């Protein structure tokens, strides 16, 4: 299901609306924040999102939230696993911050993976895990 949010900090006046998607499959709950641009989630959005196993969150700034704001949103959602997205990659000409800035801000040691295969029984139970998917 989808949850309405904004692509900017001006209630959509600059970049319009964004949809947060909640995907439930095989007892795993994934939250994809899309081009989320708000500084933080509203109480209503947090309630609609609910418990999250895997959070896919933009971290590059400019068109979405930046590293510091992403850490704030992560603290609101408290997922078991984090997958950053929308950050600077080699050859990309858009002005985005690299994932290293987010990793430093978050303070977790990332696990680099080519492909993520996950089952409910393999989700972390104690500490949040940071996954960097390789391109």
Question: Where on the chain are the PLM-derived regions?
Answer:
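Core dinuclear metal-dependent hydrolase active-site scaffold
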Residues: 1-50, 62-65, 112-135
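Binuclear metal-ion centers of metallo-dependent hydrolases, dominated by the metallo-beta-lactamase
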Residues: 81-135
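Proline-aspartate-enriched helix->loop->beta-strand connector
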Residues: 51-57, 61, 67-87
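A generic short-segment signal for beta-strand/edge and adjacent turn/coil regions
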Residues: 23-27, 52-53, 97-104
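Short histidine/acidic/glycine/proline-rich micro-motifs that form metal-
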Residues: 9, 61-62, 87-92
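Short, charged, surface-exposed secondary-structure boundary motifs
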Residues: 65-68, 92-94
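A general structural detector for well-ordered alpha-helical segments in enzyme core domains, enriched
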Residues: 19, 45-48, 69-73, 98, ...
């Amino acid at each position: 299901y989808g949850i309405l949010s904004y692509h900017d900090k001006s209630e959509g006046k600059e970049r319009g609306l964004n949809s947060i998607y909640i995907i439930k499959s095989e007892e795993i709950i994934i939250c994809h924040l899309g081009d989320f641009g708000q500084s933080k989630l509203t109480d209503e959005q947090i309630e609609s999102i609910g418990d999250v196993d895997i959070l896919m969150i933009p971290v590059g700034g400019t068109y979405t939230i930046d590293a510091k704001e992403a850490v704030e949103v992560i603290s609101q959602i408290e997922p078991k696993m984090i997958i950053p997205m929308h950050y600077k990659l080699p050859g990309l000409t858009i002005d985005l911050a690299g994932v290293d800035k987010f990793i430093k801000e978050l303070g977790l040691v990332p696990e680099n993976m080519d492909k993520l295969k996950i089952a409910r029984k393999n989700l972390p139970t104690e500490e949040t895990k940071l996954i960097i998917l390789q391109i």
